[in-house]
Structure formats: C-alpha cells, structure tokens
From Swiss-Prot:
Record key words, sorted: Cytoplasm, FAD, Flavoprotein, Methyltransferase, NAD, NADP, Transferase, tRNA processing
Protein name (database record): Methylenetetrahydrofolate--tRNA-(uracil-5-)-methyltransferase TrmFO
Lineage: Bacteria, Bacillati, Bacillota, Bacilli, Lactobacillales
EC number, as in UniProt: 2.1.1.74
Organism: Lactobacillus gasseri (strain ATCC 33323 / DSM 20243 / BCRC 14619 / CIP 102991 / JCM 1131 / KCTC 3163 / NCIMB 11718 / NCTC 13722 / AM63)
Predominant location category: cytoplasm
Enzyme kind, highest EC tier: transferase
Amino acid sequence: MVKNVTVIGGGLAGSEAAWQLAKRGIEVELYEMRPKKTTPAHETANFAELVCTNSMRSNQLSNAVGLLKEEMRQLDSLIMKAADETAVPAGGALAVDRDKFSSVVTQTLKDLPNVHVHEEEITKIPKDGITIIATGPLTSDTLAEQIKDFCGTDSLHFFDAAAPIVAASSIDRDIVYKKSRYDKGEAAYLNCPMTKEEFFNFYKNLVSAETATLHGFEDKNVFEGCMPIEVMAKRGEKTMLFGPLKPVGLEDPKTGKTPYAVVQLRQDNAASTMYNIVGFQTHLKYGEQKRVFSMIPGLENAKFVRYGKMHRNTYIASPEVLNANYEARKQAGLFFAGQMTGVEGYVESAGSGLIAGINAARETVGEETLVFPKSTALGSMAHYITTTSAKHFQPMNASYALLPKLDYKVRNKQERHLEISKRALKDLETFKEEKKLD
C-alpha cells in the first residue's frame, strides 16, 4: 500500500496538512513554487507567509475564531503552536511576528525526515495516488485552469487587500497613546486620536484619493472582512466611525475624553520596530497612501515600511465539488484545503488543512475518512462550504451562526457563546476518543 501523500502548496493550509500527515508517519512530498515563481502578494520563500495582517483575530473562547483556535490546539496544530510561540502583544487577540512565525513553520517542516520539499510549480492535477491541493487564492494560472476544468464550473473570485506598515521610530509618541479597547488585556495598541475637524478632513482626502488600476475590480467583489478603507469610506461619511476608526472604549488619557475618531496601530513584530495600521487595507496608489495616511495625527512623519496593496483571490464552488471531509466528489484521494475552498481567514484556512491532512493520512492507511461534528467550529465550517447554496456561495469566516443553537436559553450573548464553545470542545474530545485521534 502506498504510504506517501503529495501536498501542493506551502501556505497555512498546506503546511498544516503536511504536519498532520508527517506526525502520523506518512511520507510527504511537499511542493511549493516559491521562490522560483512568486505571486503578487508574497515577499518571502517561507511556508505559511502571512500576506495580509499579522493578526489571527480573537483569542477568546466567547468568539468563534477563538473557539476554532482552541479546537486546533487540541488536535496538535503546527500553525497554532507557531502562532503561540511567536505571539506579540495584541490585547484579547492573537497577533504574531510574521517573519518569526513563518520561519518556525518552515524550519519545523524542513526538519522532519519524512517531509520532502520540492521547490517547483505543479501544473497538472495528479490523477493517481493521494493528493492535497492547497495552493491558495493566488494559485498559478496554469494550475488554476486545470482546477477550473476539473471542477466543471467557473472559478469564483473576490479581491483582498493588505494594510500598510509604518516604522515605530517614525510615530509621534507625543500624540499617540497606548491602550487596548475597554482596557481589555494588556495595553497593546498605539492610538491616534482625531478631532471632528481632523476626521472630516481625512475623510474628504481619502474618498478623493487616486487608486491603483486593477482589472475587473468592482465594489461587490470585495470580501467584507478585508475591505479597503477607501471603499468603506465611500459607503458613507460616518461608516468608518463604526469600523476601524471606532473611538468607543479608547479614552485619551491626556484629556480623559473619548476622541471623535481613533486610528489604531498594532505591533507587527516582536522587536516592536514596526506597526500596521489596523483595518487600513487599501488599494490607493503608493504616493496617495503617503499623502493621505500622513494626515493621521501621530503619523505626520511616518516612514512606510510596506504600503498597502490589493490582489485577486480565487476559490472553488465547494458545494458542488467537495464532501465534508474535504475530498473531491469525483476523484477519490484528491483533497482540497485552504482559502481556495471558500473558508476565509488564516485560522480557518489552517483548520481546513488540518482536516484534509488527517483524512489523507487515514485514506493512505485504509481507514475511513472523518467528518467532524457540526457542533465544532472545524466541523461547522466544513459543513457550511459543502452544503450551502452553490449559487450564492461566498467565502465564510468561523461564526457562531454556523453552529447549532443551544437547547436551553442563555440571555447574555457572551455567556451564550461561551456555552456553545464549551459544548464544542466537549464534543471534540468525545470525537477524538471515538476515532482515536492523537
């Protein structure tokens, strides 16, 4: 019996899948086309490079992605190990030093004797053996065409964007102040307060700023969770005040009052030499980013280490293509994982790779593949992307809306979410014992 599996793609999902396979004694042939062939969004040759934000969002069990993280920790996730090991201060969220994070993942996999890394592009879907395709939303054109033909449907797409990063040394510390919203967790964010006059001056310049040309870009194709700040601003002059510029819970210690608007800066590396502008994904031209974002109090003389940018993301019509074990319906032994399946977010992508890796390993040794319980965050994501309406299919983050309701009432929303999380972790533990998952 063949005891090796091919994993195509060394992103979050592919890296997690390779880890889950390798720890079960499977020989892994891991293909990653970088650095020989790169993408519009990647900057390094490392596995699991974070191309958008450095935040993995909430770390709280009263939040769906916090639950997802804990489930993955219970299943010995490499991505969660690396994230916890390279975490930087972020209040109640989990943010990482992006370079250290990807380096830990890369080195861990390369050190495993049964993971064989191939730096080359795969242009055809293997017809034999067991394969996991986790090439991400920036799959090379040649393979993307193969996947499109295999799926028998037009590939779907949306546009994703990354926020700018500024040098810590260029931030005016006399203006900004350190605080987390509602003083939750440690004071992890630098806050740039705006008066009403400063906000509306910034708003007018932002909505009139020139954007870079991107073929096929339309507002309707922007994923809501990573919307460019200029697109958000154009939806209404006060829209940003309910989004990334929300001032609630961020009183200025100098005045004791809540500013009209607040722009937050989050630490981007462990050395605290870089900060990203939270929620400021953008597709403005670089010169316009410098001009407009330097209007933010405290960033008048900011040095931009990286400007924001936008790229096209592609995903497959999973409801028509996949089973809830992430295996293709029309080819046994072929699995898909990551953002290309329609799960949206770093942690969600890694979670799909975790399931695909476990199932590919089980199929390799002749065991039944697993469908995780719908009452878990992992299972609810797999269930959603494979059973929802294909016609209206859109990328989806982890959400309590995907999980079954409690069979008893809990009025307080946070307490209700905690109860759902407790049930999920209990069900996962039972599932692990029944299926002998280590």
